[in-house]
Amino acid sequence: MKGRRIHLLVLLIAALHCIAATTAQTDKIIILKSARQMTLLSGGRVLKTYKVALGSVPVGPKQVEGDHKTPEGNYIIDAKNSHSQFHLSLHISYPSAEDQKRAGSMGARPGGAIMIHGLAAPFAYLGPLHRQTDWTDGCVAVTNAEIEEIWKLVPVGTRVEIRP
């Protein structure tokens, strides 16, 4: 009987740990462009890692509007769009003041509308196959199932670090 209680206690603790892990809120996102990987963190602890597709010109930081590059630097999630043409999207606060200055020095605009998003309805069937190539205009793309999970885990105000 005592052994059974201990076993039940261990199962209960494990279940509570799983529930806590799935309800933790992300406080930082790290995107490693070279690895095509996005990691959600909470208090320095990895919550989840996703494979991603990037801008169609993935090497180097975004410099000007229309260059199809994914930015590099430190940003925040400053808005969520539940009516996105890409299922759901989280807006990244690009361009920063530094990004604006760099583009201005080239006589150009820095661009904007950089998001973490899912797949447009006509392409949702592709699921993880969409990652076979970098195809966005500079955004970070995941599957629709993944963006639904990310949507729940990432609040507005979350820090985003995009590394080469």
Question: Whereabouts are the PLM-identified features?
Answer:
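Short Gly/aromatic-enriched secondary-structure transition segments
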Residues: R45-V57
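Exported/periplasmic cell-wall-interacting domains
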Residues: A79-P164
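Bacterial Sec-dependent signal peptides at the C-terminal "C-region" and cleavage site
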Residues: L12-Q25
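N-terminal post-signal-peptidase region of extra-cytosolic proteins
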Residues: T22-D27, K33-S34, L54-A79, A97-R102, ...
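Bacterial N-terminal signal peptides that target proteins for export
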Residues: M1-L9
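Well-ordered beta-strand positions in beta-sheet-rich domains
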Residues: K28, T49-K51, N74, A113, ...
